[in-house]
Protein backbone atom coordinates (compact mmCIF):
# COMPACT_ATOMS: atom_id res chain seq x y z
CA UNK A 1 0.00 0.00 0.00
CA UNK A 2 1.27 3.45 -0.79
CA UNK A 3 1.85 5.92 2.03
CA UNK A 4 -1.37 7.89 1.56
CA UNK A 5 -3.71 9.30 4.20
CA UNK A 6 -1.55 7.67 6.86
CA UNK A 7 -1.88 4.24 5.22
CA UNK A 8 1.11 2.35 6.56
CA UNK A 9 -0.30 -1.17 6.60
CA UNK A 10 1.62 -4.05 4.97
CA UNK A 11 1.43 -4.46 1.17
CA UNK A 12 -0.34 -7.82 1.52
CA UNK A 13 -3.26 -6.14 3.26
CA UNK A 14 -5.89 -4.33 1.17
CA UNK A 15 -5.62 -0.56 1.60
CA UNK A 16 -8.58 1.25 3.15
CA UNK A 17 -10.95 2.97 0.74
CA UNK A 18 -10.72 6.76 0.94
CA UNK A 19 -12.84 9.31 -0.90
CA UNK A 20 -11.09 11.16 -3.71
CA UNK A 21 -9.57 14.25 -2.16
CA UNK A 22 -7.62 16.97 -4.01
Curated annotation (Swiss-Prot):
It comes from the Eukaryota. Keywords: Amphibian defense peptide, Secreted. Its main location: secreted. GO terms for cellular component: extracellular region. GO terms for biological process: defense response. Expressed by the skin dorsal glands. It is found in: Secreted. Lacks antimicrobial activity. Does not inhibit the formation of NO by neuronal nitric oxide. Belongs to the frog skin active peptide (FSAP) family. Rothein subfamily. This is Rothein 4.1.
Amino acid sequence: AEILFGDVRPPWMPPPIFPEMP
